[in-house]
Amino acid sequence: MSIDHDLHQMLFQQREAQTQHLEYNQEFQYYNAIASGDIENVSRYFMKEDDQAYSGDEYGKLSGDSLRNARYHFVVAVALITRICVEHGMERETAYTLSDIFIQKMDHLQTVSQVAALHNTMVVDFTKRMQKQKKENAYSIYVMRAIEYISAHLHDKLQIAAIRLPRQQAVT
């Protein structure tokens, strides 16, 4: 079977069952709440910590095995959260290492409910770190990027041109 055939078949089945993935803007409201450190808003989205977690139509089905499906969704979520938090000023190496730690912890879990509980823990951890960062840092994203570059190149000869963020790559 071809991918196109599979795609058309699945889209047809979803239309027949009247199911669809979570709306894009709703998904990013959630991710932006994490990145802005809004723990109150984020808590509204907590995962039910039971064996039905990740099984709703809005999540999509990544595997027929419920535990593997939960694991795949966890990895997708932590990858997106990591990148959005970096985009909003979290130090890159901290974010990626935190992501690695959570994925390694998830890899040892044996039930969907354990994965869901770790998912909630991971979301709270990233959200609180972003909240703390916003309170502590009065630096612009440009200064944060320069600090990150300098930290990563402590043993290299630093040049201003390499540190400077070009206007077209500027992040607001």
Place the predicted regions along the sequence by residue:
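Generic detector of short alpha-helix boundary/capping microenvironments
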Residues: 18, 65, 134, 151-152
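Basic/polar phosphate-binding segments, predominantly the helix-turn-helix DNA-binding elements
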Residues: 133, 153-172
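A short, Lys/Arg-enriched amphipathic alpha-helix from helix-turn-helix/homeodomain DNA-binding modules
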Residues: 135-158
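Short helix-to-loop capping/linker segments positioned immediately adjacent to catalytic or ligand/cofactor-binding
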Residues: 110, 130-136, 160
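Short, conserved alpha-helical segments within structured domains
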Residues: 98, 138-142, 166
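Hydrophobic, helix-rich cores of sensory/ligand-binding and other regulatory modules
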Residues: 1-129
